[in-house]
Amino acid sequence: MERMELIAPCHFGLEAVLKREIQDLGYEISNVEDGRVSFYGNAEAICRANIFLRTAERVLLKVGSFKAVTFEELFEHTKKIPWEKYIPKDGKFWVTKAASVKSKLFSPSDIQSIMKKAMVNRMREHYHVDWFEESGASYLVRVFLMKDIVTVGIDTSGVSLHKRGYRQLSSKAPITETLAAALIMLTPWRKDRILVDPFCGSGTFPIEAAMIAANIAPGMNRSFTAEEWSNLIPKKAWYDAIDEANSLINDDIEVDIQGYDIDGDVVRAARENAKEAGVDHLIHFQERAVKDLRHPKKYGFIITNPPYGERLEEKENLPGLYREFGDSFRNLDSWSAYMITSYEDTEKYFGRKADKNRKIYNGMLKTYFYQFLGPKPPKQKK
């Protein structure tokens, strides 16, 4: 397949992290917008992006972009896209998702049905058939309208990329794997420094940190929709990407990554998830309350997603919980703490104003990534 444009959606506020990841894979960025990064690549890039990107939600193959303010325009422009170039005669195809922002066309169901009709019309004319069996591979179309500009892509990932395949057991409000990885990558943490999550839940932060430290690609243990696209991507491209990922793993390393939680059942679930991810030997999990958080090591990192009170009765406990967290952190005077939370009184009860603060959307929930910075460790004498 010739050079194409790919679109990688991500969490709002984390585009710079994903952009850096894509550049590290060797691909040229074509555009950065709120919640997505576009780049150029080939068939191999589809495989490598799905397997290696830690912070993308999925990878879309861009097939068209045009302006439409009426359903007639939407139909005609959709019909002009050379769908036969991407979808074989036996392919299963539908518009699985439509999103519209500040556009005249705003009904997702209408957008989906009109675009599907236009696709069928185009492909009927090309394949000279009246109906399609749709017995082959799946081609899921996603469309996004922003200020009347329609962007059309075919989803190469299928299930969202935050589904790494290791989370068998979950705590009640887990952070997604893609968001956890992005937040870790926003910090200056490196594998030679201790990392502790005192509210580890099902273990997402420690597991993602261990996978980063051991250079384990996040998409190695799952499948992707585009694996079945034999008309576009040779199987060898997938095998080569997996071989590359395997060759880069270095899990024979010394790291100090720890996860604590007050709930023993949750800690056991975290251990099982770490085992599924192949990093259980790199993480120490322990049942421990945040008021008992202490450590003899210096210059450590806390990266965590503390409770922020989804339910009213939980909200009443938050001042005490954040106060305990702040008291424990003050005793770790050389450490840095990074926490994502939507709790508006975080700084008040934590007892310290954040050195940096970043707004991040976790789905539709507005959260803040508070950064409480400790001193830098002294440079080692050579």
Regions found by a protein language model. Give the residues of each.
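Short, charged/polar, Gly/Pro-enriched secondary-structure boundary elements
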Residues: 44-51, 159-162, 378-380
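Conserved S-adenosyl-L-methionine
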Residues: 175-295, 310-311, 317
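C-terminal catalytic and target-recognition region of SAM-dependent MTase-like enzymes
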Residues: 289-382
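A short, flexible beta-alpha/helix-coil linker loop
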Residues: 100-103, 160, 307-311
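Non-catalytic nucleic-acid substrate-recognition regions in nucleic-acid-modifying enzymes
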Residues: 2-139
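Residue-level signal for inorganic ion chemistry
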Residues: 22, 95, 143, 305, ...
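Class I S-adenosyl-L-methionine
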Residues: 96-98, 144-186
